[in-house]
Amino acid sequence: TGLCYLDADLHYQDNGLARVLAFDQLASPEESSFFNWSKPFVQLETTRGCFNTCAFCVSGGEKPVRTLSIDAIRQRLDIIHRHGIRNVRVLDRTFNYNNRRAQEMLELFREYHPHIRFHLEIHPALLTEELRKELACLPQGLLHLEAGIQSLHEEVLETSMRKGKLADALDGLKYLCSLPNMETHADLIAGLPLYRLEEIFEDIHT
């Protein structure tokens, strides 16, 4: 673990390292007297790091992925629920990097329906059949998904070192969009290597 700070000249310093390895031992921010409950949503980080190696992301290649236990997440959600928060934005870089854990998380989220809605970032190329079935059975309105497509050009994704085949991602996106019980948005990223401006507009209209 490193130390991040501003020096006397207000320049950012981190000694080249600022990483929390014992992520599950951090104090819950919701228990702090300084936590800001004035917003209509709360951001919740249940994992830190990412299995993927996307060159455009600061978390790309940050392994191992560190996780909180389901019980620890439940305790935090209980606090959030007691404060009347109805929207939780899960900050995990790839919610379904581990499909078994993703299914356990979805079962946990069910416990808070209809009081809390969850916003997740999901990699559509990694959807297993089991996770698809789980998503299809969730209560109406429990989830709002952001599906990371990033580009409709395979060479752009390969150059950006993003794992997952485009064909699989599009198949997963098609499935997610067919589900009537949740809202799904697809993400594209402008400015990726080899991604020309006209191609971005073509992808938007596809």
Predicted ranges, named:
Residues D14, Q25, T159:
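Conserved beta-strand positions that form and line the central face of beta-propeller blades
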